[in-house]
């Protein structure tokens, strides 16, 4: 973060610090996990959900904070028995289910407006039997189809346009499969 100074009578000796704008936006997300319920908000590549505990993700909320650009984050999930949600959720609305014991099987996430012009949104999931899949970005599908396998965890990152994609061992979690979406 940086600070902006306001000068009184044009001299620096009379300046006061005003909190400035931190130019790095954040992506924040939380998941509803089988038996555990809603987890706390995670951000910027932290793992939300579980892995190694055989618990399904049932719902997800995603939002942006600290944005210097217009636009939003939109997302939709592939839900057990229902398939892909017909509409996109955005800005913290819940995608998936709560209280229905339905697993999430895949997800798509995209940015809109100026955010989409300046950032890519990367995400990857921990899928039952496959582990961490490769990174998907900008609306691509991440997860499985035709297997009836649950999502167990997710990581989401904002990356400035033109910057390198996240590594396959981001956050110490090693990618098990380079595919982002596995269909039967």
Residue ranges and their predicted role:
Residues 9-23:
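Extracellular fibronectin type III
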Residues 1-9:
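Beta-strand-rich modules
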Residues 22-184:
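Lectin-type carbohydrate-recognition ectodomains
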